[in-house]
Amino acid sequence: MPSIISSTNPQYINKCVNNGTMASSTNVPDRTVGSKSFASSVSKNDGRLMQQMLRAFVNKALDDKAEGNFAGYEDLRRQFAAKSDTKDAPSSLQLQNLLSALTCNVSRLDSSNSSLVMSVLDSVWVSRDESFVRCYTRFLGNLISAQSNYLPLVMTMLIQHMLYRPDSLAIHYEHAHMALKYVLELVPRAHSFLYSSILEEFPYKDESLLAQMTYISNVLSICEYVPSIKGPVLHAIIDKIIQIDVEIQVEVDDDDEEEDEVVTDDDGTSNADSEVITASTLYERHTAISSEMTSSTILTPPSLTDTRQLMQQLDQLLYTLFSYLDSNLKSTSRDRYLVYNSLIKSFVNTVLKTFRCRYTQFLIFWASQLDPEFTDIFLGVLTEVCLDPSQPYTLRLSGAMYIGSYVARAKALEKNTIQIIVNMMTRWVEAYLDQCENELSDDLLSKHSVFYAINQSIFYIFCFRWRELCVSDESESMEPRPNEWIPGLEILHRSVLSRLNPLRYCSPNIVLQFAKVANHLNFMYVYSIIEQNRKGIFREGFDTMDAYFPFDPYRLTKSSIIVQPFYNEWQQIPGLDDDEEEEDTDYESSTVMLGESPF
């Protein structure tokens, strides 16, 4: 019997494929018979024979190509390369039959036949029916099992289907996840290519919000069936978020500098009639955004100079990550500790080292308050970074700022925890004074910057947490007497009166507020020292610590609903008259206000 597949006529093969069946008779139909006559002459129940014939065709095409005859091979490749919306595009059934035949011949799809494989990988499949998707998924599994060199390409292709496309539906992403999960289970080595593929396909920060959200949501879904990549993926997402965060602060700072130039006359004097634009003003201006996204906002890529849109993008991304972490960190499984440790690692490796970061750090601020054990871990990391002399001094400065801001603002902190942290800091100050108080230096701020940063954090904590620093457990309205403060707090007296003079080098905003609170609560009177320092500033120039507190009030709209229940707002002290001290007015007006007040 002559073989049907022995024909090299691709049109005849197309007829066989188009009809999806093959004649059950051993007689070969005449090739000149019309398609309707041919269709009526074949059996609808002989799918097995059809598969045998197609496998033979695929083998023949590959054999012919090896011998230099590319006709059958190219015809096969074109079936998958054809665009699905063209007139002559093959149907899903046609391609499915060919895929089944290719699946039985994956051992022959080596690098010499990579063009055919690439056409299959580039073909449209996620939008086809379930039967086709299952067939395609089986092909992928068999391909990388037999030809591991295609594994990186297959992983990249699958991850690319997690990206946003205007015509994508939820079911399309479900198909991509199903195929990826199958491949990972079938070929364990595929895990080694997963994270690198995810990282490579991350949208750029100037892409649309919908593109960012779609990809991140899909990647977080991958983490649910591949828990081993949760840590690296969280770090990658936080890294992307922090890039946007920093860019916003750069924009705000640049706008602030431009406004400073506008309100200064040619002679260098300040124009009193002009509006003074501070970082706080810009902050409010750029954060007056809607909590809900419009369709036009979603589909339009944000301009890098549009701070308002960048903040909306940052807000939505943080909300998504907050929501994902909420379900993970509140679970009862041990995985919650793995997720939290991943957050801690990202904080230490990235966030803590990023000075301009404004909002990303609230992920750890919120997460660390979900469990007392989480709180202890976070504070342990901060104190180790801050108080360890082997750490770089820039990192220690950042650690000191974070301790001060966290202890002041974290609402869930227990009184005992606050007292322990403050006691650790004051004991460190005491030990530092014992060692360095009598050292002479021309640049005290540079040489003793960590000392000043820790003192500044203690001042800041005192203003917010004076109630918790009292021994008495009476109501919040009470005014403690000097003997009611926790042991160790008296070290601040020695520090303030020391030759290192922290009130001179700490932020004026913090110093003035500390002076008011400490005087009102009868803790100590420091206005005379401030006055001496003011005179020294006029002689020597103005040089103080930055008033950077990373957990300043949270201004993003949508994600703030998650942060606010855990946030300790500034509260006026009972009985304190804000205007009771007039002697600090000259000092305050002679200094440069460093952005938004930390109170």
Swiss-Prot record:
GO terms for biological process: transcription initiation at RNA polymerase I promoter. It holds the Pfam family RRN3. Keywords: Nucleus, Transcription, Transcription regulation. GO terms for cellular component: cytosol; nucleus; RNA polymerase I transcription regulator complex. The keyword Iron does not apply. Residues 577-587 have a biased composition (Acidic residues). One of its GO terms (molecular function) is RNA polymerase I core binding. Residues 577-599 are annotated as: Disordered. It is found in: Nucleus. Belongs to the RRN3 family. Required for efficient transcription initiation by RNA polymerase I. This is RNA polymerase I-specific transcription initiation factor rrn3. It comes from Schizosaccharomyces pombe (strain 972 / ATCC 24843).
